[in-house]
């Protein structure tokens, strides 16, 4: 397994405190976490940074939206890789380790993302009819 310090999880959030707390609790403390909290809730920042030393909460001057939140998080990251995530999507320690290992093996890539394994929840998205069977697929499965 790779060094956990080489990836930062970045969350763009708006009053997603419950989800952020759950992620911080469940992830290895060696992973860095940056939350750009658009609710401007300074109390949340103080509480979570005190409880989880690997977590940094950035509060912009106003609600900047998801895309700019990610950009702010990326600008404040000091690790080799970043993982952009929404607060209500769970990711495991193993998945993050595997993504970093995969990134180290591939070296030349633009975007690397995990596969969603529970397709029964989103069955209407599986087998996308708009993707031709002839479409070349360069998917690296981990």
Residue positions per predicted region:
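Short aromatic/hydrophobic "clamp" motif used to bind/position activated sugar donors
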Residues: 82
